[in-house]
Design a protein with these regions (language model features):
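Short, charged helix-capping/linker segments at alpha-helix termini
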Residues: 6-11, 25-34, 44-63, 165
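Structural recognition of an alpha-helix C-terminal capping motif at a helix-to-coil junction
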Residues: 45, 59-66, 70, 79-91
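Helix-turn-helix DNA-binding module
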Residues: 55, 134, 138-142, 150-167
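Short alpha-helical "packing" element that flanks the helix-turn-helix/winged-helix DNA-binding module
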Residues: 129, 143-144
Length: 168
């Protein structure tokens, strides 16, 4: 028979973290500060493993504790509070990476210059595209820019933006 052992200190620390999460769920901000002090090094190290820069890891760290504070009441005490916190950090880091891949940071003035430089885009098409860009969502703008301006194929856009090809 195989037994898994958990050290007394690990068990005790999990209980302390669960107690802090319970207090946070009741609005205790000092409990959030204590949780942060006890777990920040581990969360930051994990965020650094996923982030491209230390600044991004810091952002994930701070966003993680904001999310912990706002959703502490949803934590189900099962002896794994660090796993719950790390899952929040992982999801936030992934969202940040997706968003960074989707950012193209092209201003409206630059959009006109891009279209003007594309000889295969007529002036009528240019006006139509500029008008469309003003009413499209950010995701839709990125799709149009990648396809109409950069000539990227739909399946490549889908992979780049982590979307189904049918959405593109």
């Amino acid at each position: 028979m195989l037994f898994m052992t958990v050290s007394t200190s690990e068990y005790s620390e999990a209980k302390v973290l669960e107690s802090l999460l319970s207090r946070i769920a009741k609005g205790d901000k000092s409990a959030l500060g204590e949780l942060y002090e006890r777990t920040r090094a581990a969360v930051f190290g994990f965020a650094m493993s996923m982030a491209s820069t230390p600044a991004d890891a810091e952002d994930v760290l701070h966003d993680t504790y904001l999310a912990v504070y706002s959703s502490a009441e949803s934590y189900a005490a099962k002896g794994k509070p660090m796993a719950w916190i790390m899952t929040i950090a992982k999801n936030l880091a992934r969202m940040r990476m997706r968003k960074a891949r989707r950012q193209l940071d092209i201003a409206d003035d630059d959009w006109g210059r891009y279209l003007a430089a594309k000889s295969e885009v007529s002036s009528d098409e240019r006006v139509l595209l500029q008008t469309a860009m003003k009413i499209l969502s950010d995701d839709e703008q990125q799709i149009v820019m990648l396809h109409a301006v950069a000539g990227v194929k739909h399946r490549e856009i889908a992979a780049l933006l982590d979307m189904p090809t049918a959405t593109v």
